[in-house]
Design a protein with these regions (language model features):
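Structured mid-to-C-terminal alpha-helical surface segments
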Residues: 1-124
């Protein structure tokens, strides 16, 4: 998950790797996650690849509202015959709920001793 997150951050607005977004969505939908474990993995991956958290283009409105990107997302979902037929905006929204609190904890150099609950789709 950390590598997929780093990939879509480093690619910025040029990102066309819809599988990364989808895979993270599926993991958040299907599994409970340990916050500290995920935070440490993200921190290690971003540090190793020298990627910053300053600009996460995928979390900007212009990224999710782009009509071409939405069309490509629907084509990806159709071609993949995805089990979870989710809209692009809903996918990005879940990724924000999942990942922004971890990024905030990294910025503040704080621990993140929470658990992701797959049922509520939130940190507890």
């Amino acid at each position: 998950m950390a590598e997929k997150f780093e990939a879509f951050v480093s690619l910025g607005l040029a990102n066309g790797r819809y599988k990364d977004f989808y895979d993270i969505y599926v993991l958040a939908d299907r599994y409970n996650l340990d916050g500290m474990e995920l935070k440490n993995a993200i921190l290690e991956t971003f540090s190793h690849r020298e990627t910053g958290f300053d600009d996460i283009a995928a979390f900007e409105d212009e990224f999710t509202e782009d009509v071409t990107r939405q069309r490509r997302w629907r084509a990806f979902i159709k071609k993949k015959k995805a089990l979870l037929k989710v809209e692009f905006e809903d996918t990005i929204q879940l990724l924000k709920v999942l990942l922004i609190p971890i990024v905030d904890a990294i910025y503040k150099d704080e621990s993140f001793e929470k658990s992701w609950n797959k049922e509520t789709k939130n940190w507890m």
